[in-house]
């Protein structure tokens, strides 16, 4: 991924700070969340050494990433211990690939086998392991992810803290601020924009479902959400039309989103011979079943907050996003 990031950053550093044409494909629209590389290009223009302009910010983004992720869990679960545990599970994912790592060590007990195996055990296709380590597949190579995802979490934290209050105490100002940031997310990390959009769409219904506030008026929370949506729409619309028009057309024509139930174990998938439940167990281990059990044990209010993440899981198992 970094070769592509260097190319895009070079465009901003040595040509123009504003482009709408793709730096690699002649005549193609620029349809990538570019701000992270725009910042690096700006640093190069300011005199920073080229590679340092990419490596140093990415190092900072990684630290901020872990901090914001932990903060998100702490805000939701109100426990430092749970926040640390959840962050560790998020970062050290990889399913049951470690089982084959232990087998390799058993068959060849050596320092080379322990520390220098050539097999990536969180991406072991022939065994059905495809849920690659977040660190090696996302945080290190995907600069837009490590930059944009924490910002999306900040929006989620801001909205979450508001919807935990009594309806009359919701802050319109904070919803507008959240809308401003959310609307800019397509330039930061498009997938975070889409995922957070689904999550917030589900959270929209919390004041109408949660029984504690039945006697309160729903007008104020509805107004807050309208303020958020209108602000986000004003910011996001020109960005989407300028940089993602081709993607939007592809989506409406059905060529961007495809019905593909089962994902990797679909009849046309890479592991069509495997059972869907077994495939997910291989890739998530006990994390997914324990998460489902934990959801049923949660208070109703927490269930409403966590439910959108299960919605995302279901959607990604039914549709293929190109």
Tell me what each language-model feature is.
Residues 141-155, 233, 258-321:
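Alpha-helical transmembrane segments at the extracellular/periplasmic loop-to-helix junctions
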Residues 136-139, 174-189:
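Membrane-interface alpha helices of multi-pass inner-membrane proteins
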Residues 1-151, 190, 194:
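Active-site lumenal/periplasmic loops and adjacent helix-entry segments of GT-C-fold
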